[in-house]
């Protein structure tokens, strides 16, 4: 073992100060004057050990650019920005482990100069500075060992002249190169830009650092560290049957295999399928092979429909069926995909017990893009990192050939083809592993199965370890009386993660697989017609917009162009179509809360446009919002839906269990969680202004329109009901039990003049009422908010309102309250709420202050949850789902964000858990007793189709399983979990079922932006 008699020098002052702003050039010769940063940016020195031959390792970031707010004041001291401090802190914590304690590092950059304007180093800068970096590494690294580099960004690899397809594809893999005749081992990890976006990425960073320090330890113990482990070494004990007899013998051996005296869970087998397509519903689907593992290092691959397979699917069906129906516990990684694939081929898999992708999400809920098997393997089993490179190189080569061929064809075409939708291109290139030779596919597929099983065994232990560690932390914290409430667990279940896996994740996986495979019928004729009509409406809308735009523009105005819109809103102004006056917001940027881009230009995003509509009644902004919504709906959603449903007339959306940190589902192909609502646009047609309504949800209908109903059960104000459970607010609980609409209730309480003005000096009463939009004539009662349509009327139906102006203001104020309440419950800050909702900060302040006074439990809940984040680092729902927010190692801005995310998490996660529980509960009853089929789940709703004769029973079904059953399973819920149940021939044509008949569903004309606002508030939290 190496001896360390003294601590290396850690001063940062011995490196000479070379800064072309403050002294001589950093780089001798001509390089600095040719650089973009020359005399525009400061030079930053490295940090850590800097004596010659003293560094055991180097941590290299791309540049000193500060991604987020920093309290750094010295213009030349590097690695002192907030994210960089967090990185150093994690390294220091890991080095407290005895085996890593003797090793010291140097923290430096691939490029040394930066400024606010210089977000990303250019290729020229990297080239110029690489000589400085190489000299630093050779000078400070220990002379008798390879140079070890922990890389934080793709620019670092460029400095070493290493070319990779994508930086993300090599993260967690050990790379090798050479400088000045010395071997260099590089471990690429997350960049500072990535670390600035998600708190969960610090878990990935920590795992990478741990692996890297292990390599440091191995090298200092003269152990061989080889980044190029061979596939033959990994697959030495694998089996690859070549006859049907060998297939039968393999299955017999797997079923008979057991580990005497060990936990029965270790008898599990892992399964994985390799296919020629990513879409299970496609006619071209072939299961190229099935891979299985039954112990560490024991795996096999059974060819099935690969072109080189010596038998047919039917030949091996009996053997595979025995395997799938056996009592052996089954393990998958992203099992939803494999279950769909096998179901298409007529197989059912019994005793599914574990999904390693979902288990990883239960352990680390916020590391999006790092739930793939190869990413997890790189973190847990570094010797396997990069095992799939050969297959990915083949696939990349095929993609590159297709790109070149398409470019060549495009040049030869005389008439350009219309732009292809993203989905259409994805389908056209969907070949899966069909180009991979069987021998290669067998080996790599079997490694997948082997690693999946190894990972499952490790995760089982991690579940137990975390439960034990958290229990101990809570016990220690609860010793102090003031921390007992904070230390209390969310659930009494001693093993909540295991319960979630067995009781929620696995059942949900099976049901979602069935829903995805079934798909939802697309009325393609209607969708195509709608696309044409929307194109016409968009053209007319552009004409209407152009009439507001100054004629002096030298080019046609494009509503999607931020640059042109900015020049009008904050430059020339636009013409109000009603008054004819010129409107411009230049000089009012601060007043309306304008945000700025990274290039210091006024942002023209949706938040600003909504603010202008709400605060200023901006006609141009409203038309732009509508136009952009239509453009997105037509060119993205409808175009992709038509492409994805072309083969069988159905959309087979892909639900993602690991898509959000809260446990809510996300989806893709196509994103049904973001399905546009009805869009109503006023356009001038032949000199006459008309309302044109585009019903996008109508695209989705039942399988048999003559005999079936499309039912949508939507949880009513789910988040507010969950808040009532966590806050125990007596007034809110009473209102919900009495069946009151929570948003009208909040509005009536807040906008009562006596409540609103309680803490306002008398001389400011009038100004406050004017600020909020309340007069002293109307009542502003709960009944009035509920009956706003009576006051407002309906021009389209010829119904004259009793007080249209009052009705309009009631609707506006109710929406504002609804949005503000959601923002608070989601943990958004007041200024974020103001900018997203589209009200002034002053209005937001008054409303929030009144809410805090009327409902003090809101503030108490928020404060309590933030204290849990600060002291325990974990918040837990009633179901035991956890959000890990260890703020100690986070930069300042992410620390604040983590506290808000804790507030957001409890509400959203608990609500989602109940909705998904109802989805799972009704599945079997729906199919068995009502002849129905689950189709979708969107946010807090569940959609299914049933025969028309059972329409009335849909309400009973939801009452039994969505209200009564939820009440029994959730005794902590003090209010009924109510639902709005609607039905109709399609998703977009719905009437409310009340048990005795139907009543019209009242449509919100601004519904298309309501969900957008809600999503933004959730993201802000």
Can you name each region flagged by the protein language model?
Residues 417, 425-434, 508-517, 614, ...:
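Conserved catalytic core of nucleic-acid polymerases
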């Amino acid at each position: 073992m190496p001896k360390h008699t003294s601590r290396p020098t850690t001063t940062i002052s011995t490196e000479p100060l070379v800064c072309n702003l403050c002294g001589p050039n950093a780089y001798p010769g001509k390089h600095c004057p040719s650089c973009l940063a020359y005399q525009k940016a400061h030079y930053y020195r490295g940090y850590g050990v800097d004596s010659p031959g003293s560094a055991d390792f180097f941590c290299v970031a791309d540049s000193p650019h500060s991604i987020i707010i920093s309290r750094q004041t010295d213009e030349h001291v590097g690695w002192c920005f907030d994210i960089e401090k967090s990185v150093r802190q994690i390294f220091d914590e890991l080095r407290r482990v005895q085996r890593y304690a003797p090793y010291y590092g140097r923290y430096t950059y691939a490029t040394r100069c930066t400024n606010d304007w210089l977000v990303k180093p250019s290729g020229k800068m990297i080239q110029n500075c690489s000589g400085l970096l190489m000299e630093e590494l050779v000078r400070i690294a220990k002379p008798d060992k390879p140079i070890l580099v922990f890389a934080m960004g793709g620019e670092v690899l460029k400095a070493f002249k290493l070319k990779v397809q994508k930086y993300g594809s090599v993260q967690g893999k050990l790379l090798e190169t050479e400088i000045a005749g010395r071997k260099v081992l590089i471990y690429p990890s997350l960049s500072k830009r990535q670390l600035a976006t998600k708190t969960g990425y610090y878990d990935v960073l920590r795992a990478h650092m741990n692996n890297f320090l292990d390599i440091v330890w191995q090298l200092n113990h003269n152990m061989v560290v080889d980044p190029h482990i061979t596939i033959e070494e990994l697959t030495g004990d694998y089996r690859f049957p070549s006859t049907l007899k060998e297939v039968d013998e393999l299955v017999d051996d797997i079923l008979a295999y057991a580990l005497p005296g060990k936990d029965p869970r270790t008898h599990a087998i892992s399964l994985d399928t390799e296919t020629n397509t990513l879409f299970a519903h496609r006619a071209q689907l072939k299961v190229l092979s099935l891979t299985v593992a039954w112990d560490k290092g024991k795996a096999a691959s059974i060819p099935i429909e690969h072109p080189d397979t010596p038998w047919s699917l039917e030949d091996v069906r009996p053997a595979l069926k025995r395997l799938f129906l056996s009592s052996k516990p089954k393990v998958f990684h992203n099992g939803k995909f494999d279950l769909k694939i096998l179901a298409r081929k007529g197989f059912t898999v019994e005793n599914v017990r574990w999904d390693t992708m979902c288990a990883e999400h239960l352990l680390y809920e916020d590391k999006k893009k790092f739930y793939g098997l190869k990413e997890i393997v790189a973190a847990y089993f570094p010797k396997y990192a990069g095992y799939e490179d050969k297959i990915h190189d083949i696939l990349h080569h095929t993609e590159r050939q297709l790109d070149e061929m398409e470019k060549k064809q495009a040049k030869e075409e005389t008439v350009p083809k219309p732009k292809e939708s993203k989905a259409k291109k994805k389908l056209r290139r969907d070949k899966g592993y069909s180009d991979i030779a069987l021998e290669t596919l067998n080996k790599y597929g079997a490694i997948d199965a082997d690693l999946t099983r190894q990972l499952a065994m490790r995760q089982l232990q991690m579940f137990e370890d975390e439960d034990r560690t958290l229990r101990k932390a809570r016990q220690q914290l609860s010793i102090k009386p003031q921390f007992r409430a904070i230390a209390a667990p969310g659930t009494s279940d001693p093993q909540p993660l295991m319960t979630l896996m067995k009781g929620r994740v696995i059942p949900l996986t099976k049901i979602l697989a069935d829903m995805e495979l079934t798909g939802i019928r697309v009325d393609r004729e209607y969708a195509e017609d709608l696309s044409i009509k929307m194109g016409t409406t968009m053209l007319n809308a552009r004409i209407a917009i152009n009439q507001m735009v100054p004629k002096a523009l030298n080019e046609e105005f494009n509503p999607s162009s931020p640059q042109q819109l900015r020049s009008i809103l904050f430059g020339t102004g636009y013409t109000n179509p009603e008054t004819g006056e010129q409107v411009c917001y230049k000089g009012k940027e601060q007043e309306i809360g304008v945000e700025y881009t990274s290039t210091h230009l006024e942002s023209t995003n949706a938040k600003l446009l909504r603010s202008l509509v709400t605060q200023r009644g901006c006609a141009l902004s409203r038309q732009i919002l509508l136009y952009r919504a239509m453009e997105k709906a037509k060119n993205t959603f409808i175009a992709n839906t038509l492409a994805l449903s072309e083969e069988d007339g159905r959309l087979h959306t892909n639900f993602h269990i690991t898509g959000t940190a809260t446990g809510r589902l996300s989806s893709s192909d196509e994103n049904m969680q973001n399905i546009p609502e009805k869009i109503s646009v006023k356009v001038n047609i032949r000199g006459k202004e008309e309302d044109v309504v585009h019903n996008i949800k109508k695209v989705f209908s039942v399988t048999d329109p003559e005999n079936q109903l499309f039912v949508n059960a939507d949880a009513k104000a789910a988040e507010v009901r969950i808040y009532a459970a966590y806050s125990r607010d007596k007034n809110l609980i009473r209102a919900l039990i009495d069946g009151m609409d929570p948003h009208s209730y909040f509005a009536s309480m807040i906008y009562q003049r006596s409540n609103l003005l309680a803490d306002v000096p008398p001389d400011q009463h009038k100004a406050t009422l004017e600020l909020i939009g309340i007069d002293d004539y109307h009542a502003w009662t709960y009944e009035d908010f509920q009956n706003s349509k009576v006051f407002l009327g309906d021009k389209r139906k010829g119904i004259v309102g009793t007080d249209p102006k009052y009705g309009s203001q009631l609707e506006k104020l109710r929406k504002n309250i609804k949005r503000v309440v959601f923002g608070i419950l989601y943990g958004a800050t007041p200024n974020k709420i103001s900018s997203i909702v589209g009200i002034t900060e002053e209005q937001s302040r008054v409303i929030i202050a009144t809410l805090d006074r009327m409902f003090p439990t809101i503030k108490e809940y928020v404060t309590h949850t933030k204290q849990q984040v600060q002291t325990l680092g974990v918040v837990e729902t009633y179901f035991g789902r956890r959000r890990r927010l260890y703020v100690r190692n986070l930069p300042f801005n992410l620390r604040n964000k983590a506290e808000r995310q804790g507030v957001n998490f409890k509400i959203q996660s608990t609500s989602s858990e109940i909705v998904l529980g109802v989805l799972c509960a009704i599945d079997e009853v729906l199919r068995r007793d009502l002849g129905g089929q689950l189709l979708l789940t969107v946010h807090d709703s569940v959609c299914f189709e049933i025969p028309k004769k059972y329409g009335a029973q849909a309400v009973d079904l939801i009452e039994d399983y969505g209200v009564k059953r939820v009440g029994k399973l959730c005794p902590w819920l003090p209010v009924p979990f109510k639902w709005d149940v609607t039905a109709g021939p399609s998703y977009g044509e719905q009437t409310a079922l009340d048990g005795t008949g139907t009543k019209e569903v009242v449509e919100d004309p601004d519904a298309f932006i309501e969900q957008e606002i809600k999503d933004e508030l959730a993201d802000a939290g």
